[in-house]
Amino acid sequence: MKLLLTIFLIHLSCLLSGQPNKETKAVAADTISTANERLSRQNYNLPEIQITAYRTSGELKSTAGSVSVISADRLENSAVNIVSSLSTVPGIVMQEGTLGTVKLTLRGIGSRYPYGTKKIKLFFGDIPMYSAEGETTFDDINPEYLSRIEVLRGPASSIHGASLGGTIILYPRRAEFNIEEIKLNSSIGSYGYFKNGASYSNGTPKNDLLIALSGIQSEGYRENNKYNRNSFFINQNQLFSKKLSGNLVLSGSKIRAQIPSSIDSATFANHPQKAAANWLNTKGYEHPDRIFAGYSLRYQMPRDWEFSSSVFLNSRKTEENRPFNYLDESGFAYGGRILSQHTKKQGSTTLHFLAGTNLYFENVRSSLSENIGGKGTKGVLQQKGKESIYQTDLFTQLEAKIKRITITGGVNFNLSGFQYIDQFTSDTINQSGNYNFTSILAPRLSISWNILNDIYFYTSVNKGFSIPSLSETLSPLGLINRDIKPEKAWSFEGGFRASLLNHATFIDLAFYYMRVTDLIVPKRVAEDVYVGMNAGSSLHRGIEVTLQQWIIGRKRSDTDRHFALIANLNYATNRYNFQNFTDNNIDYSGNKLPGMPDQTFSGSLDLKTPIGFYTQFELNTSDKIPLNDLNSQYSKGWLVMSMKAGYIFEIFKKLKIDATIKINNLTDEKYASMVVVNAPGTSSRPPRYFYLGLPRWFTCTLNLTYQDFKK
């Protein structure tokens, strides 16, 4: 905290000492409105959304791929983390057992893993947020630190590495130009929920700075369900010259979360507030800490060339008390990216070329200790080791825009491997070894065709892959399985996007077909032990639809606030099946992948009024979900609604006050917000498949924003 305060004071003194020049004053006068005008600056036609994930800035409607964008306005609906925002993306199934137990699947990828998010890459700007084990966590990401999210559905990004499920890119929030701003917010809610946040930002012509702090705590609805998180975020952008700029991002979080774990069907029906008995006895918890930093430089070179480079550090440490053992783990990742790109225009043709490399290294130390009697007392060491992993991606991409047609071709070349050193010498098994995976070439080809005005068709072919983690490569005897192969998939997509009725309507329709081969299936060999095996293939097919509609309201001027009614609808229907899978002499071919509903739907209706009053109604539904490979048991489908009402007003044109109240799970639906697939069970102990979704609960929030517009 002392270091943070020192950084805050140094930057603050530097920024306050800088004065905008006359040229900047003129620009500011033309582009920056007063605080009252900013309240009304809502585009009453749907704005043209820009996509930058492919490193070729363009409009969403003309992008040749399945991409979804979550704006800052939508992120404001996520109180604790980005879970509720991501759940509105068609193709994503987001499950939240507790505030600290989150699982995301994208187009069915990773559905068979009982916990956590696998085979989907997450980036915070250019900083990788996934671990050496290939796992991504979402529960410690504060939506207030973000300006938008871009979701690439399917293995479509040769630039970020063609991950099997897709890529999620978080774009950090930054200070607004020529505005000094202080924000304070506080929320209180049911089940002991409490949140405080504060941020300071200052934007000047040559640099801008944003510093934010946040704290969240909750008693939880269930037993052994307390949660506490503190986090900070710093984002600074510096313009060194007309051609050279730099960006620094620094963020960290500290979480203390109890674990109630999943429950069986009888407990779910009769005593859903109870924790699993063994987790309650040991007072199970997880204590993850994380800090990450990244610095990037961008240089505009002669003849329309641009060079950029970035480096990152990502440090994490966690302690987890579980009924079967204690886990202590720490990881330190580092790496960087180098990228060159060039744009050339000739007549009606525009060519955009880029090439670069991503480097990722991580060292992980972990140990398992006995939990004596499952009562929470740490015992003797059972396992200890060190893992070093590397991933190198070389990529290139060429985009050609020829009148109404855009053709994009790209390729990613991946080299990956790891070394494991077994530091536990009390047994006869030595798990030490090196493993270098066969290099993988993942191409991408896409075509976008502007058939009429704002109507576009696109098609793409992509190859994706997923590298096995260390735990997946170890055999039941603890030896490295050198026969295991990376998963691979070819994905075929087609889609249609249109902006209609004077940009009041936006439609996004996508079809996809993906076949995953060398399918890595996690096989449970103990309550906490899974090993991987290549087990045939799976088939993933689906349709995804997004509709945005301004029902009432049009923009007449920047200074007027008008009545507006906006609808957002997202729907996905899919068929995910084992195509060829046999385990323990049982043939599961043709069965549905467990953990995935056939249909999901989310929608919202937003009302805005000239007097500052606004409301939002949200609805989310899910079809029933198969709970095991046999498809012999299903969880019930559900429909959950929420409603929010708020009022915005200003004092002295500089202070904006926003007060809201939200009712979550409006109808008090009893549903499973997360399921644990293939949960083990016996005749005396039924399988614990279910996490309970919270009953009806309330939050009240007060936001204060002070803005000083520089002249």
Please provide the spans of the model-predicted regions:
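Face-selective signature of the C-terminal outer-membrane beta-barrel domain
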Residues: L239-S253, G284-T425, D508-F511, L547-W550, ...
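Gram-negative outer-membrane beta-barrel transporters
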Residues: K401, F511-R515, M533-I625, N703
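Short acidic/polar hinge/loop motifs at secondary-structure boundaries
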Residues: I127-R153
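Transmembrane beta-barrel wall of Gram-negative outer-membrane proteins
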Residues: E181, I188-Q217, R222-P260, Y285-M301, ...
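N-terminal periplasmic accessory domains that precede
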Residues: E37, E48, I82-S85, K103-T105, ...
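Membrane-embedded beta-barrel scaffold of Gram-negative outer-membrane proteins
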Residues: E306-F312, R316-E319, N450, Y456-N462, ...
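Structural signature of Gram-negative outer-membrane beta-barrels, strongest in the C-terminal barrel
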Residues: Q346-E362, G385-R515
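C-terminal beta-signal and adjacent terminal beta-strands/loops
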Residues: H562-L565, K624-P626, Y647-K711
